[in-house]
Amino acid sequence: MKIALITDTHWGARNDSQVFTDYFTDFYDNVFFPYIDDHDIDTIVHLGDIVDRRKFISYVTLRSFRDHFVQPMADRNINFHCIVGNHDIPYRNTNDINAMREIFGSSVGKIYWETQEASFDGLKILMMPWINNTNYNSAINKMEQTDAQVMFGH
């Protein structure tokens, strides 16, 4: 298994600026996914803040995100994991409502909105989403109780 880590992609940045969108799509089309192909990477872990706007996502941004990130992963049968970041949630005090879960449900990869362990070829990794008032105690308890030697977080 080979894993690519990516974080803070902020789709829809700067009020859905076309300049930023063009920059993002160029990166995915000409750098990121060609690298994935060249290095036989089969898993992508996004460490949070896939989207930029906390309160809403425009249809134009969703289409670009789908066409240049989600579909290329599907075309390659990529195993996708995503940790919820602070820009992926509309409320600062809970991760329960989050952009990825609301858009995709359980149809695209594994989404971590609560702290939990994941296993990658037997390597245990603690997945730590955005910490807020609601999940703080649980997150700390899971950090103290895990025997994972690696943690990915936002």
Language-model segments: residues:
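Short, conserved structural micro-motifs that define repeat-unit consensus positions
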Residues: 1-2, 149
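Conserved donor-binding loops in enzymes that form glycosidic bonds
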Residues: 7-8, 130
